[in-house]
């Protein structure tokens, strides 16, 4: 139910995006979480678990983010790691007349000019992955199906975007919803979020 609200909320996003992958265990085998988030607003715009870390997964992840924009920004910029699947995904969208700037940062050692220019992007993706692992995934000790892994990821994204205060945002949430913020404690905020999701489902 929360997915309706997370997906359809009218986010106010910037042109600066960052993406990354991390792994989770599903039935004891490695699967891959693809994240894209707004570098400035700290809003997660794409989130999905795939059984392969391939070009199709990158394309689906980027497309999920593009759907969050009413109109694609002219200077949309996506900063990712050095995985070549993102170059192929960029080519795919270019052939569909949906161009965007792709910047690939190799590692965390600041060995190249690009690495030195975009350290905040690298730090953001590392913090997001760390938050997911420490605050969500480690308590689950893996998943027994891909469907359950993605269901849990929806809840994590709802929490991260609407309920979790961020130090870099002066303890504000990435998305401030008055109906949620007026609730006295976290359980009440979750209930309100689910109520809003139900209303979105019936709209």
Locate predicted features.
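Two-metal-ion RNase H-like nuclease active-site motif
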Residues: 10-26, 35-37
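Active-site proximal helix-loop segment of RNase H-like, two-metal nucleases, encompassing DDE(D)
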Residues: 113-145, 163-164
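C-terminal domain-tail junction helix/linker
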Residues: 138-203
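Conserved beta-strand -> loop -> alpha-helix junction used to position metal-binding or nucleic-acid-contacting
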Residues: 82, 90-120, 124
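Short, basic alpha-helical nucleic acid-contact segments in DNA-binding proteins
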Residues: 1-12
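Active-site beta-loop-alpha junctions of metal-dependent nucleic acid enzymes
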Residues: 47-71
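Acidic/histidine-rich, metal-coordinating catalytic segments
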Residues: 73-87, 106-109, 173
């Amino acid at each position: 139910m929360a997915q309706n609200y997370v997906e359809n909320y009218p986010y106010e996003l910037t042109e600066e995006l960052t993406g990354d992958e991390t792994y989770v265990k599903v039935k004891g085998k490695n699967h891959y979480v693809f994240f894209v988030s707004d570098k400035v607003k700290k809003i997660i715009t794409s989130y999905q678990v795939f059984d392969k870390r391939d070009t199709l997964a990158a394309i689906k992840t980027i497309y999920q983010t593009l759907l969050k924009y009413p109109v694609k920004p002219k200077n949309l910029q996506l900063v990712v790691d050095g995985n070549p699947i993102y170059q192929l995904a960029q080519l795919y969208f270019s052939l569909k007349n949906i161009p965007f700037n792709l910047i690939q940062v190799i590692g965390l050692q600041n060995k190249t000019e690009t690495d030195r220019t975009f350290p905040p992007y690298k730090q953001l993706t590392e913090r997001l992955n760390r938050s997911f692992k420490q605050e969500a995934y480690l308590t689950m000790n893996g998943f027994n199906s891909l469907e359950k892994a993605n269901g849990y990821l929806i809840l994590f994204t709802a929490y991260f975007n609407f309920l979790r205060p961020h130090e870099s945002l002066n303890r504000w949430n990435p998305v401030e919803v008055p109906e949620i913020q007026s609730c006295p404690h976290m359980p009440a905020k979750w209930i309100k979020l689910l109520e809003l999701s139900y209303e979105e489902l019936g709209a």
